Amino acid sequence: MKTILVEFKTSLLITLVFAVLLCGAYPLAVWAGGQLFFRQKANGSLVMDPDGTVRGSALLAQNFSSDRYFHPRPSAAGTGFDASSSNATNLGPTSDKLANGIHAKDAAGRDVDDLNNFDGIKDLVKAYRAENGLGADESVPADAVTRSASGLDPDISVQNATLQAARVARARKLPVVQVEALVASHVQDRDLRIFGQPRVNVLLLNLALDQESAGR
């Protein structure tokens, strides 16, 4: 009986110690480290107006669809850009749905709105070329027509942003060189100069674009 009590006491003590460490000390240390060294990122990388109005997060894509703005990558998060439903298409490279999409038709063979409709890469390439005034044989950046693994990638490639500059400039009646210069000023280098590719944050670029237009 004494042996059982000793073992129970030891087990209880170990449980309490690890509960304090793993449920208290460790989370507190991680939180404190985040607040001390990565305060902006730890708090969601929120982007705010001078008056404190939150415009979004620099870590999450938003669905900019107007010609006056740069567009993010396509999204498969929920019905698109749903931060509560981060997701990829999970379609393989040989998938016919990924390449050609799915489009519901009516009795006359015309496209109709349907929850199961899905734009394939060929559809997205065609739409991208049309909205940006590109030729039928002009190369389209891969990130412009593919959905990211999270569906919420906030960045686009420099080539993607550059190809959209003429459309944005035309919609805002700004010189193309002015918009291209704004893109160039928002290019972020590779992480640690070796990981990933140079990129442009769409939300930050679009907010700077609004400020540029307002200052004319």
Residue locations for each model-derived region?
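Non-catalytic, structured segments within soluble enzyme domains
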Residues: 168-216
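Cytosolic juxtamembrane amphipathic/interface segments immediately preceding
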Residues: 1-9
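Flexible, solvent-exposed loop/hinge segments and secondary-structure transition points
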Residues: 6, 14, 23, 28-30, ...
